[in-house]
Amino acid sequence: MRLANQTLGGDFFLLGIFSQISHPGRLCLLIFSIFLMAVSWNITLILLIHIDSSLHTPMYFFINQLSLIDLTYISVTVPKMLVNQLAKDKTISVLGCGTQMYFYLQLGGAECCLLAAMAYDRYVAICHPLRYSVLMSHRVCLLLASGCWFVGSVDGFMLTPIAMSFPFCRSHEIQHFFCEVPAVLKLSCSDTSLYKIFMYLCCVIMLLIPVTVISVSYYYIILTIHKMNSVEGRKKAFTTCSSHITVVSLFYGAAIYNYMLPSSYQTPEKDMMSSFFYTILTPVLNPIIYSFRNKDVTRALKKMLSVQKPPY
């Protein structure tokens, strides 16, 4: 009997990625390990930045926000996915599905804007170092971070209620491991073309505008680095910027694939793999790419872990 015939109270069924794998138990253990690493590493980074006064700078303020987003990101999807697999129960309530969708859109929108704000921070630090403390004051950083969270919240509030209001009479089986908008829309038996146009326009704003800000910022950064006489200064600037560019490429590449490419280029399997990459792998990679190879962070970590030996 199909899962859709067992639906009670309008519940959905997350078919997930485990049905595609010959050894789901091993994949479940792997995902749980990744989840634990992502949670522990991001919490550690947040604590480091909070405790160590030398990390109280605009750059680490934004990294702190990024870690908070990544921590919430992976917590929205992975626990439910693992519980469903272990309990052999693929159901998710309509409320639970809508909650997943909202937080996913909110966090995704906030991260899009935050990565642009981080690029602007690097632009000011490298191109206008003498005015850095004024242009990137604590008040400015708070305004930028608050704006990122606000834009993400607006994105979630606009798209989620409309998506969940469509009638789902074809099936309640979601070909995904969480309630992502494109996967849920495929179940609707009504015309969703207008909503898809609206969502596409939102993606243009949330993806292409930040990408433009990042591209322009790095254009001027590269020009400034090229003019630097100090080899050490160039190396430090390139190291900082390369970390950010790596994070940007990983996140925006997967997001643009999922939300902006024509549906003819996409399949449920490819969509799940793309979403798996930037909802599960990215939160565990970001602390490594952006911070734990940074000398300031490693020094702060050693300082936090150091234990005073009692005198004998």
UniProtKB/Swiss-Prot annotation:
Superkingdom per UniProt: Eukaryota
Bilayer topology: Multi-pass membrane protein
Coiled coil: none
GO cellular component terms, A-Z: plasma membrane
GO MF annotation terms: G protein-coupled receptor activity; olfactory receptor activity
Glycosylation sites: N5
InterPro entries cross-referenced by the UniProt entry: GPCR_Rhodpsn, GPCR_Rhodpsn_7TM, Olfact_rcpt
GO biological process, one term: detection of chemical stimulus involved in sensory perception of smell
CDD domains: 7tmA_OR2T-like (cd15421)
Signal peptide residues on this chain, from the entry's feature table: none
Keyword list, A-Z: Cell membrane, Disulfide bond, G-protein coupled receptor, Glycoprotein, Membrane, Olfaction, Receptor, Sensory transduction, Transducer, Transmembrane, Transmembrane helix
Residues on Cytoplasmic side: 50-57, 121-139, 220-236, 293-312
Extracellular side: 1-25, 80-100, 159-195, 260-272
Pfam families: 7tm_4 (PF13853)
Subcellular location: Cell membrane
Disulfide bonds: C97-C189
Segments passing through the bilayer: 26-49, 58-79, 101-120, 140-158, 196-219, 237-259, 273-292
Similarity comment: family membership: Belongs to the G-protein coupled receptor 1 family.
Xref: PANTHER family: OLFACTORY RECEPTOR (PTHR26453)
Biological role stated in the UniProt entry: Odorant receptor.
Protein name: Olfactory receptor 2T10
Species name: Homo sapiens (Human)
